[in-house]
Design a protein with these regions (language model features):
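Start-of-helix register in tetratricopeptide repeats
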Residues: 29, 63-68, 102, 129, ...
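Register position in tetratricopeptide repeats
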Residues: 40, 79, 113-114, 137-141, ...
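TPR-repeat structural position
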Residues: 44-45, 83, 117, 144, ...
């Protein structure tokens, strides 16, 4: 009789555990979907809250789902301009898997925003963007020849970093413009326009350079 009673209790307990797990899974998924929707609509504060709620339901366990939620949270923080908080998460993720390209890229982007160019470069990803940021600082400091040299290095190191190549090309045109060689700058920026389509600042620079032809 006692054995039968124990069996019934165990079965009931197993059923309760299964129901609890199903409830947790359902709510984790709901929070994840809410977070992604907020991320898409640029409501970053609410996205972060939703991802935190999803993570909280895991009770400290860090698996694939939790790592993905942390990654989304870091993305929301990065987009909102909270680079230090995003950096802390990417550091944590990277420490667990240093071969993960997504973690390395996110970490490198945060390091660029926090000014640690050397460490960003050491990660070996988005090299074009790293050198472009260095060149931009050199341009802002009036060191145009140094910037052009950095840009050439960036092109050689960019690899598959097409975003970096685009940024390098634009900054190359700006450096030549500031050196006073409007013809060279226009030539580069027109090539940029053909490949990437000049918009925003690039479109304004292109229009300006076209008005400067004949003044060099």
């Amino acid at each position: 009789m006692m054995a039968a009673f124990v069996a019934v209790v165990l079965l009931a307990g197993g059923g309760a555990y299964g129901a609890r797990q199903a409830w947790l899974q359902k709510h984790r998924q709901e929070y994840a979907e809410q977070g992604l929707a907020c991320l898409e609509s640029q409501d970053y504060a609410q996205a972060i809250t939703a991802f935190d709620d999803a993570i909280a339901l895991t009770h400290g366990r860090i698996g694939t789902f939790e790592s993905q939620m942390m990654l989304y949270r870091a993305e929301a923080q990065y987009r909102s301009g909270d680079y230090q908080s995003a950096l802390a998460i990417y550091e944590s993720l990277y420490a667990k898997d240093e071969s993960n390209e997504t973690y390395k890229t996110g970490l490198a982007l945060c390091l660029l925003e926090t000014g640690d160019y050397d460490r960003a470069k050491s990660l070996g990803v988005i090299q074009g963007q790293v050198y472009s940021r260095i060149a931009k600082d050199q341009i802002n400091a009036g060191n145009y020849d140094d910037a052009l040299s950095t840009i050439e290095t960036g092109f050689s190191e960019a690899g598959a970093d097409e975003v970096g190549r685009e940024e390098l090309t634009y900054n190359q045109a700006v450096a030549w413009e500031y050196k006073g060689d409007y013809k060279k700058a226009l030539e580069i920026l027109e090539g940029y326009d053909q490949k990437y389509t000049a918009e925003g600042n690039a479109a304004r620079e292109l229009a300006f350079l076209r008005t400067r032809q004949g003044n060099h």
